[in-house]
Amino acid sequence: LDDRNYDDLEYLYKIEVERSTFLTLEDRTYLEWIKTIIDFYQYELQFEAISHLENILSKVASTTLIYLKVLNTLSNFYSLVGREEDYEANYSHLIELYQTKNLDHQEVLFGYIRVRYNYAHYLVSKEKYNEAMQEALETIELCKERQTSYQLAPLLVLVGNCGTQFLGKEQVKNYYLEARELCKIYNNPLMLMKIENYLKELDAV
C-alpha cells in the first residue's frame, strides 16, 4: 500500500480471492478492506467504499487490529471527500484505542505512527502548520524512542516544510538532510528526488 501501486494490489487481491475457500472472519474482513481501497482509488467509487467500510466496522470488534486498520482507512477517506468532522472524530477515537494497545508489537506501533503521520498531513492541508509540526515532532520522538525508521523520513520532511514558517534556514535544512540520509539508506528514490528539490529551493532563498 505504501507505494500506491493499486494495479498490483488489485492483482494480488484477485489471486487471494480465487484461491481462498475457507477463510476466518478476520481474513475475510481483511480482503474486504483491501477491496475498498481498490474501489476508492482505482475506480473512484468513493461513496461506495466509505459505505462498505462503515458496514465492516459495525461487524468487527473494536479490540481487533483489523478494526484499527479499517477505521484509519475510513478516516483517510473522510478527509479526502471533505468530511472533516467525521475525520477528526475518528482520529480521536483511534488515539483512544491505541492508548489501550501494546506498542511493543510492531504492527500496532506502525499503525499508531501511521495514524499520527496522517493527522499531521491533514493539519498541513488545513494550513495549521504549527500544530502539524508539533504532531510530527512528537511522532518523530516516538520513532526514535522505539528505534524505528518507519515513516521517519516523511515526518522529517513534513517538519522541514512546516518549519519554513517558524524555523531558521539551517534548522529546516537539517531536517531535510536527515530525511535524505534515511532515503539513501532505505533506497527510496522518489522521496529522495523530492527532498533534493526542497533543498534546492531552500538554497535559492
What function would you assign to each model-found segment?
Residues D3, Q42-Y43, L74, V81, ...:
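Structural motif corresponding to the intra-repeat A-B loop/turn of tetratricopeptide repeats
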Residues Y13-S20, S51-A61, S92-L103, L137-T148, ...:
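Amphipathic alpha-helical segments of tetratricopeptide repeats
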Residues K35-I37, L74, Y112, Y119, ...:
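Structural register within alpha-helical repeat arrays
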